[in-house]
């Protein structure tokens, strides 16, 4: 049985963190990203979706 949370998303950092508010930097770090073009697979949960929504202008999402 596949749960909604078993899905994963690929998140890629596409913009630099220079000049970005500190809260947004922390959100990017919570996603496991640190350098431009870093890519991580993260679980598709409401918490992760909230982090991505907060920094949507810094990241690119692939299914």
Swiss-Prot record:
Keyword annotations: Ribonucleoprotein, Ribosomal protein
Pfam families cross-referenced by the UniProt entry: Ribosomal_L30
InterPro entries assigned to the protein according to its UniProt record, in alphabetical order: Ribo_uL30_ferredoxin-like_sf (IPR036919), Ribosomal_uL30_bac-type (IPR005996), Ribosomal_uL30_ferredoxin-like (IPR016082)
GO cellular component: cytosolic large ribosomal subunit
Any one Gene Ontology molecular-function term assigned to this protein's record: structural constituent of ribosome
UniProt keyword Ribosomal protein, yes or no: yes
Superkingdom in the source lineage: Bacteria
One GO BP annotation of this record: translation
UniProt entry tagged with the keyword ATP-binding: no
Assembly, per entry: Part of the 50S ribosomal subunit.
NCBIfam families with a match to the protein in the record: rpmD_bact (TIGR01308)
UniProt similarity note: Belongs to the universal ribosomal protein uL30 family.
Name this polypeptide is given: Large ribosomal subunit protein uL30
Organism: Xylella fastidiosa (strain Temecula1 / ATCC 700964)
Gene it is expressed from: rpmD
């Amino acid at each position: 049985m596949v749960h909604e949370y078993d899905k994963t998303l690929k998140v890629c950092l596409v913009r630099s963190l220079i000049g970005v508010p500190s809260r947004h930097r922390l959100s990017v770090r919570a996603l496991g990203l640190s350098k431009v073009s870093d890519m991580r697979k993260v679980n598709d949960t409401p918490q992760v979706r909230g982090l991505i929504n907060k920094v949507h202008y810094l990241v690119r999402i692939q299914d």
